[in-house]
Structure formats: C-alpha cells, structure tokens
Amino acid sequence: MKRLLCIALTLALAFTAANAQEALKKVYNETVDPMEQIDNALTKAKAEGKFVVCQVGGNWCPWCLRFADFVEKDSAVNKTVSDNFELIHVNYNPRKSAGEASADKAAKLMKRLGNPSRFGFPVFVVLNEEGNVMHIQDSSFLEEGKGYSEKKVLRFFNNWTPKAVNNNR
C-alpha cells in the first residue's frame, strides 16, 4: 500500500511540474532567421535611442521561459526594459537533428554574439546601437530560488542602459 501511495504521489508531482512548464508562454520564434531578427531590432533600437538585449535560448529551456515570464510580470523590470532596450528572444538550436542549415546558423549566431553559449541558457547579450557586443550576462547570477531576483535583474539592466554606458564616455 505504501508503495502504491509513493508511486501515486510521484506521478502527481511529475504531472504538476510538467503542467507548470507548459503554462509558460513560448516566446522563441523558431522559424525566424536570428541574424535578421537582430538586424531588425538594431534598426528599431537605433531609431529610439535604445540598446538591444538578445535573450538567447529556446522554448526547450525552462529557465528561458521563466525569465521571459518574469520580465513580463514584474512591473519595475518591464518598465526598465521597455524604456531602454529592444529585448528580443533569439532562438538557438545547434543540434544537427534540426538540419545542417540550422547548425550552421547557430554557429554563425554564436560567433556574431561573442560565443555566449559558454555561459549556459538563457544568456543575455547587450548590443549597442552599432550592433557591437558590449556585455554578455550569465543568467545564473540573476537567479534566486526557482526564479529570478528583481534586485539582481534590475542591477544588470540599469548598468547597461544607454544613459549608464554613455555617461562614462
């Protein structure tokens, strides 16, 4: 009887965890060309006096989806991001199973962004108005428990706003 109860409890917890994962909105467009996505974001950001933040990851990454959800729901973070950045979700899929073209695109993307995959996912790449990499942020430093720390995330974004960067020039 105890064994059946343990099995039932384990299955219930697994089902709950799977549903929680599915509840997060999938924010990565897997059909868009990431290079074009970055170029379009740079054009828009430059016109608005903003920088671009590339959140590199994929719909396969629970922490990537958690961060997108966090930014959307935390009003202070959302305002800081929308006032200073063009935030884009850049899909990364290096697997050969996705096709040779996809693997080649992934390699070119990593080269363009300064090889941010070495930090894990999600990883954030801040680009200035010219498209130059200014900073690569390891997301593990922004985590707190099973989510993200508002204080740490705001510190990261506030340190890389156009105003913060340009005041030091």
Regions found by a protein language model. Name each.
Residues 48-62, 87:
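Short active-site neighborhood of thiol/selenol oxidoreductases, capturing the structured segment around
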Residues 64-82:
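Typically the conserved alpha-helix immediately C-terminal to a functionally engaged Cys/Sec
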